[in-house]
Amino acid sequence: MSAVRPLRPERQAQKQARGAAARLSGRRAEVLAALWLMAKGYRILGFRLATPLGEIDLLAQRRGVLAVVEVKSRTSLEAALEAVTYEQRSRLRRAGAHIAANRAGLRDAVVRLDLIALAPGRRPRHLLNAWPNTGNDGQ
């Protein structure tokens, strides 16, 4: 095995700048998605919500539904759907169930995994129940 060489300072700075730009872009996408959901009558319960099972981009509620919303900024809806792996879907499903079970007022809510796909120059696409729990979760 060879040792991993550290990045040159200029490469490290470029990598950090790309990471910062990606985080800012992600936050902007989440704010836009939250505004879209609020316009559709959802109440936003949390942004980048940390749970023992992982982070949820947006947690929203409307009527008896608790929507665990994954936000993806991609060129197409298909690319956004493909960007969320089986492991991520499983983690999101468990995190949503954990929140519903541990928060008063949400115990009877139906937990649903939604996707909001954002693409440059297009309206946000809100895909309800993007990954139905079919037992094999699309595998």
UniProtKB/Swiss-Prot annotation:
Domain of life of the native organism: Bacteria
Molecular function GO labels: nucleic acid binding
Gene3D superfamilies (UniProt xref): 3.40.1350.10
Lineage, broadest ranks: Bacteria, Pseudomonadati, Pseudomonadota, Alphaproteobacteria, Caulobacterales
PANTHER family, per database record: UPF0102 PROTEIN YRAN
Pfam families, A to Z: UPF0102
Name used for this protein in its record: UPF0102 protein Caul_0175
Annotated S-S bridges: none
Span of the signal peptide: none
Family the entry assigns: Belongs to the UPF0102 family.
